[in-house]
Swiss-Prot record:
SMART domains: FH2
Keywords: Membrane, Signal, Transmembrane, Transmembrane helix
Segments crossing the lipid bilayer: 102-122
Native species: Arabidopsis thaliana
Protein name: Formin-like protein 9
Amino acid sequence: MQNFWFAIFFFLLTCAPPSPLSYASTVTLSRRLLYDYESPLPLPLSPISPPFFPLESSPPSPPPPLPPTPPTTFAVFPTFPANISALVLPRSSKPHHTSPTLLLPALSAVLVIATVIGLALFLYGRHRGQTRHLKNSHCSSSNTSSYGDEQSHITTNFNMAATTSPSEVFYLNTEESDHIRTGGTFFLKQDSPEIRPLPPLPPRSFHHNNYETEVNEEDEEEEEDVFFSPMASLPGSANSSPSHSCSSSCSGWVSPARSFSITMSPPNPRYSDATNLQSPSPERLRVRKNYNGNGSSSLRMFSFWNQNMGFGFPRISSASTSPDRGFIRTPLSSLYSSVSTSPDGLFRKFLDSSPPIWNDFSRNVKSVLLSHTASSRRDFVINIGESSSQQSKVPALPPPTRPPPLVPPSQPFVVQNDVKKQSFSDQPPKQLHWERLRSSSSKLSKEMVETMFIANSSNPRDLPIQNQVLDPRKAQNIATLLQLLNLSTKDVCQALLDGDCDVLGAELLECLSRLAPSKEEERKLKSFSDGSEIGPAERFLKELLHVPFVFKRVDALLFVANFHSEIKRLRKSFSVVQVACEELRNSRMFSILLEAILKTGNMMSVRTNRCGDADAFKLDTLLKLVDVKGLDGRSSLLHFVVQEMMKSEGSVRALEGIRNLNTELSNVKKSADIEYGVLRSNVSRICQGLKNIEALLLLSEESGSYGDQWLKFKERMTRFLKTAAEEIVKIKIRESSTLSALEEVTEQFHGDASKEGHTMRIFMIVRDFLSVLDQVCKEMGD
């Protein structure tokens, strides 16, 4: 790589443009130079390639820094002393200007240098990526190593770690670089002091191929024997060099049966040398695959918490297990010599490694939780911290006793704050006024209170069950009417007997007419002798039924109350129709407009079968004039007619007269909203109402009605009949005159009234035509 950068540097030196001083005069070249050209130029240091980390390491290595750009060397210019004013330089008579032709070689040289540098960087990056890809594929191919090599490799690591003295024990990530420790010629900057997570767990040895599918079931069945700590870290591989024989964690002996050992590696503020991880081992790859396939979600979550939250938990790694459940204990702590499957063992380790913020809490609980030892099923413990002579013989410890039960603390754990809050218990409660009163201070008579202030209400059980006769909707309407009614039931019955419609009013009479019961309901109401057996609505109707022909009286009084208003409405409608007929016949401007339309139609029909000699046309043609468009596509035949009228009558006068048609024919528009059939039905209904009153009087006389109330009712009804008969005669005369006027207008504009099915249709045609004509006049005026 150094040769590659040296070649680039030499090429840049050869491509550098000549100095502008070479073109200067001889006088300028005679100046004293402060730089020796013969001195060798400082060669650029070759970039130190970062150590290669295999893919099997737990944390991915940071991306390698880009190669430093080689410093661009330019031609060296002569330097001058600081006191340049003291120099006596020869001056020429004419100033020397640099030729513009010298700029082109300089610029081209700069561009060539930039192009060469970019091309070199691109080729170097591409070569580096291809090399990394080849190394990754080579590392992945090493995963297929044999099982025997793995056994020997792990056993060798265990023996090397067991023979080391406590002083020679190294922890993971604590070894320094060889270059720094041996005092190399140059200083290598150390990496960021971050804690790297350990490699994954080694696999449990099985000769079967379906290990990954069966190991989950066995772990669930024997969950008490094997427990993976949430804060577990994974043992590192052995060092590649003999000088680094002490690994960061003691690798246990791997056997077909499951066994494990626990080691600790406290966080180190420095990174370990990268050479510890340069030699990939197949067991690492297999352990990583096994850990990713069978690891529980809780283990991943606690490991993530330990690595990212910065709590500094000790890393506990389970490396191997033995059939006898042997354990390997480090000299740093005896708490982590065993992994208990119970939650209190996990909580004990969590308290021991807790940050300072939990010291108050852990100080109270640690004394209780530390009394728990390893499970009673553990047989022996091996201490690595002892001398090498003692490590050869491992004494078997007696089984520990059962841990004592947890004793709850006498006081609850409360985090004391600096600011003391005042509780309600500190202040004595105030004695209220009501607490000072005595129960025997005053005596009240319960009987007197009930007698004076409590209404006499019978027991709900003693109340009779009310029978519901009417329809629920009808009963609700009657109840609403009684609430809005200002009269009592007796007053209503008296007004019906007297025939006084002014007392009741038209609205009340209309409501009573709608509440008329059926014959079956009327029979049931009359069957109840006592009103307490029925509801208020039924009781009201029962009182009304005592009046003879009560609902016929209600209909008669309602007709009397509405008679005068109906007659007035009929008179107005008939008068409007008659005035509309007169307006159509006597309107001069409307006649001129119809004549202009007739002439225009005859002119357009000259060369047709009709020969243009029509004398009249139906008013339906007025609505079709606006649909006949001219060649311009905008003006219609009605526009042409209005324009011709403006020429003959004068533009201003004709336009104002046409616009005034809406005012002259205002009653025509009102008549278009009136239905002649409705007018005739109203007249017939009034006549039928008079006949119903006469029939009621006859029924009352035949039933033997007598008394002052009957006489009053008969007298009022007889007087009304006389007045109503006179009004009916007048209305009928007005109706006949209106009908004759309609026939005359229809014959005048349509020719034959008998062929017209709709009597009032002529008014609707004129109303629609006037609206279209008004729009045309506005367009013509604009």
